[in-house]
Amino acid sequence: MARDRRQIEQLARAYTEAWCSRDSARVAAHYVAGGMIAVNGGDEAAIAEVAEAFIAAFPDIEVFMDDLDFRQDGSVEYRWTFTGTSAESGESVRVPGYEEWTIAPNGLIAQSRGYYDQAEYDRQLQHGIDQTT
């Protein structure tokens, strides 16, 4: 398991760097072929499409890996914070969240379920990071 853990830590660091490269194909390369993600309980979508949408919405997107939690069931929780400036509203956001990963035998992400506080995200899109409604 120690070797697997190191490989997953390396995967998480590379995944974070891929998001910061603002290259959706690089993000998708960390998933099995046809990799999917579901965000906030929504329908699954192709990771490349989800990454492309976030990169378009936040052209200066930065993702920071906050922590990794290796669970008893074999899944991994990748905790992150993303920052960026909305291309639409011009407001800056700083949103923490996490993804629950299932890792495939080949060491890539087989499935991801991502979560963040949608209400706080929406508030920041309208009013910025430090402003209140």
Question: What kind of feature is each model-predicted range?
Answer:
Residues Q7-A18:
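Solvent-exposed, amphipathic alpha-helical segments
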Residues Q10, D60-E62, V93-V95:
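Short solvent-exposed loop/turn micro-motifs enriched in small/polar/acidic residues
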Residues V63, T85-S89, Y121-D122:
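A short, acidic/glycine-rich surface segment
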Residues M1-R6, I129-T133:
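Basic/polar N-terminal segments that are highly enriched at the extreme N-terminus
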